[in-house]
Design a protein with these regions (language model features):
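Membrane-embedded alpha-helical bundles of multi-pass transporters/translocases
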Residues: 2-450
Length: 450
């Protein structure tokens, strides 16, 4: 009898299947790391005011959010995850060089006025973020169709998160090489640096897109007798308390990671007065520690209770790091490397478990998976966009005068320390009250990134 029950349980995935799925978000990840880490610096370096730079970011975030909902609904109705994924990757690749390589409308109109620049970069941001969301939603919502085994689903998410870290490390290695080349501080040279970084990033990401497209099978989802796709209604999810709990945790996790990533480079340069290379080394340290944590996480046996426990550990660790960021003085800036390791671990714990909770929410309801991922992504992007707009609008493009022995309470410190820390704390409180259906961890048959 025990053998019959075991045979009925979904079989875990093998190493190759997890790998080919996990690399499918690499192009999104490497370009996203550049967007959140360097866009604010880049736009202000080429002459845009902080408020105009914030407008570009907000425009992209809202385009991302809107496309997330539309793509999620269409994927649920018609399927074809891999087609949506490929289409999104194409838009990302085409728009990324324009975003970080110069203002195309400025060249067409022959004008470098702030208004034309802002509109030009907003157009590139809209195309980039729309393509990015198509890739993201199609890739995330595939995981429940790729496997129904709860532990394998978390392993896929953990593998994806590990390659997110690899993508970011690659970007920061490229950035370290680009930013350490001796060039003048003219806008032309600055644009050339970022354009070189954009071309290299797109090439590397495209290689992994090909691996994903060739190695991952299109999930076969159920259909009605008339051949149409069966989809769960929106009201089905809106009636579930678990939906709102998971939504809150996922959105708060994204706020913590995205806001902190956006202000990190400005913080180490303007607030801690560290060397220019630190804007690549500090983020690289964060992603390296996050990568190691993600690899270790995928070897664990997972259940709903463990998802809650590990998320809470990550949230409390972020709370400690946020407090340290706020009170760190200039003469102790070397301690930022220690904080970077802790932030990376906290990010991995929160992100892997938050997405794992999404999979637990969807469970076997594959017919509505894209809506769940899309709706959560929509709120995440709207909220992050609003946060970033207001925070960046009050950001100073120049370092403020500060006593090296005492912390300067700037907008950057508030954005990097307080906002992620409080978001993580609220997420921990919500996680305490969540109840999942799965209570017993199901083991894997083999290690997945050994």
């Amino acid at each position: 009898m025990a053998d019959e029950i075991a045979d009925d349980e979904p079989k875990p995935l093998g190493r190759c299947s997890v790998f080919t799925y996990g690399v499918g978000h690499m192009l999104n990840d490497i370009t996203s790391a550049c967007w959140y880490t360097y866009l604010l610096l880049y736009l202000t370096d080429i002459g845009l005011s902080p408020s105009n730079a914030a407008t570009v970011t907000l425009t992209g975030q809202f385009a991302d959010a809107l496309t997330t909902i539309i793509a999620g609904e269409l994927i649920d109705r018609f399927g074809h995850f891999k087609i949506w994924h490929g289409m999104g990757c194409l838009l990302v690749a085409l728009s990324f060089t324009s975003l970080f390589g110069g203002c195309l409308p400025c060249k067409i109109l022959g004008s470098d006025s702030p208004a034309v620049k802002t509109v030009g970069y907003c157009i590139s941001a809209v195309i980039f973020c729309s393509g990015w969301s198509c890739t993201q939603i199609s890739h995330m919502s595939m995981v429940n169709g790729v496997t129904l085994n709860p532990t394998s689903r978390v392993a896929c998410v953990s593998c994806r998160n590990a390659f997110t870290m690899i993508a970011s490390l690659i970007l920061y290695a490229v950035a370290f090489f680009v930013f350490n080349k001796k060039t003048s501080s003219s806008q032309v040279d600055i644009k050339n640096q970022y354009q070189m970084m954009a071309y290299i990033s797109i090439f590397i990401g495209a290689v992994f897109v090909i691996i994903f497209q060739l190695g991952t099978k299109e999930p076969s989802l159920k259909q009605e007798s008339d051949g149409k796709r069966a989809t769960a209604t929106w009201t089905y999810w809106f009636k579930k308390v678990l939906y709102y709990q998971v939504l809150s945790i996922y959105v708060l996790t994204r706020v913590a990671t995205n806001v902190s990533q956006t202000f990190l480079a400005v913080y180490v340069i303007n607030d801690l007065r560290m060397s220019p290379s630190s804007k690549a080394l500090i983020p690289a340290t964060i992603y390296l520690s996050s990568f190691i944590a993600s690899v270790l996480l995928q070897e664990l046996k997972w259940s709903g209770e463990r998802l809650k426990a590990f998320f809470s550990a990550g949230g409390l660790l972020w709370l400690f790091c946020g407090a340290a960021v706020i009170f760190l003085p200039i003469n102790m800036n070397a301690f930022m490397y220690v904080l970077s390791v802790l932030i990376g671990i906290a990010n991995a714990l929160m992100m892997v478990t938050a997405i794992g909770m999404e999979s637990e929410l969807v469970d076997k309801h594959l017919d509505g998976s894209a809506f769940v991922y899309g709706s959560l992504g929509f709120l995440d992007k709207v909220l992050c966009g609003v946060f970033l707009y207001f925070l960046e609008s009050y950001e100073s493009a120049d370092p403020v005068a500060c006593d090296p022995a005492y912390p300067c309470f700037s907008v950057t410190r508030f954005s990097l320390g307080f906002v992620p820390g409080i978001s993580a704390l609220i997420g921990v409180v919500i996680a305490f009250f969540i109840k999942f259906h799965t209570s017993h961890p199901k083991p894997l048959t083999e290690p997945l990134l050994a």
